[in-house]
Amino acid sequence: MRKSMISFLEKKAKNEKITMVSAYDYHSARILDNSDIDIILVGDSLAMTVLGMQDTLSVTMDEMLIFTKAVSRGAKKSFVLADMPFMSYQSSDRDAILNASRFIKESHANGVKVEGGIEIASKIKLISQSGIPVVAHLGLTPQAVNMLGGYRVQGKDLQSAQKIIDDAKAVQDAGACMLVLECVPVKLAQKISSILEIPTIGIGSGKYCDGQVLVYHDLLGLNKDFKAKFVKHFDKIDPQVGVEKYRDEVKSGIFPSQEHSFDYLDDELLDKLY
């Protein structure tokens, strides 16, 4: 049976961790599906990981659709989530709905992910009202890397931390059914996870999120040129073993440890957030 957003809400209620992995092809999707990974994210990170681009901004809708089709063919139980690429939803309501629907109709994805907060809440509402599950993404949002000044931890001071909380509330109110928090301080992610009714998925955001996500190539140590602080290599000899180790460590709370997290907020500052 295909996993669903309802089942992920139930996991949050039961305090059971959700596992997500970014992958881009049929073979890796089969491994993840057989390893009982909850969600396979066809991330726009494929622009850098697979296509050798410098950032995620150049990948197109047509390219994302091709890779999503491949993953959908390999995933029988895992929920397939597709990243909407840069400017495929920001430009207009019409583009947002039409492009989201293409992922469902043409690539057989089960939902879509978008980056941003209050500024795209109206797009989230339109897509979700059309019957498509929407996952939001806050913190370090790679599509806004030029505005953020690079790939840096977000929410390190009172103003920026409060902005992320306000955005999180806004996307939930707009109809998002899950939220990815990338590279925010552990205590901020913990506070957001406690405030929201929808599940949070962390990457570089600590162990208190309702689930975790890593890129398939990163958790297996396949990219020797990249090793972010939040990445842990599990096993590059046997992908199935590596994925299952990742799954088990997420579910048991072993991963991520403090070693793979960022913490810039003290308790005094945290108490001022609402």
From Swiss-Prot:
Free-text comment on the cofactor: Binds 1 Mg(2+) ion per subunit.
Which keywords annotate this record? Cytoplasm, Magnesium, Metal-binding, Pantothenate biosynthesis, Transferase
Where does the chain bind 3-methyl-2-oxobutanoate?
A: 44-45, 83, 113
Q: Give the enzyme's EC designation.
A: 2.1.2.11
Q: Which reaction does it catalyse?
A: 3-methyl-2-oxobutanoate + (6R)-5,10-methylene-5,6,7,8-tetrahydrofolate + H2O = 2-dehydropantoate + (6S)-5,6,7,8-tetrahydrofolate
Extract the SUPFAM superfamilies matched here. Answer: Phosphoenolpyruvate/pyruvate domain (SSF51621)
> Which Gene Ontology BP annotations are present?
pantothenate biosynthetic process
Q: Would the keyword Lyase be found if you checked this record's keyword annotation?
A: no
Q: Which residues form the active site?
A: 182
Pfam families associated with the record: Pantoate_transf (PF02548)
Q: Would you name any one GO CC term?
A: cytoplasm
Q: Where in the cell is it found?
A: Cytoplasm
Role noted for this protein: Catalyzes the reversible reaction in which hydroxymethyl group from 5,10-methylenetetrahydrofolate is transferred onto alpha-ketoisovalerate to form ketopantoate.
Among PANTHER family, the record links this protein to: 3-METHYL-2-OXOBUTANOATE HYDROXYMETHYLTRANSFERASE
Family assignment? Belongs to the PanB family.
Q: What is this protein called?
A: 3-methyl-2-oxobutanoate hydroxymethyltransferase
Native species of this protein? Answer: Campylobacter jejuni subsp. jejuni serotype O:2 (strain ATCC 700819 / NCTC 11168)
Gene name tied to this protein: panB
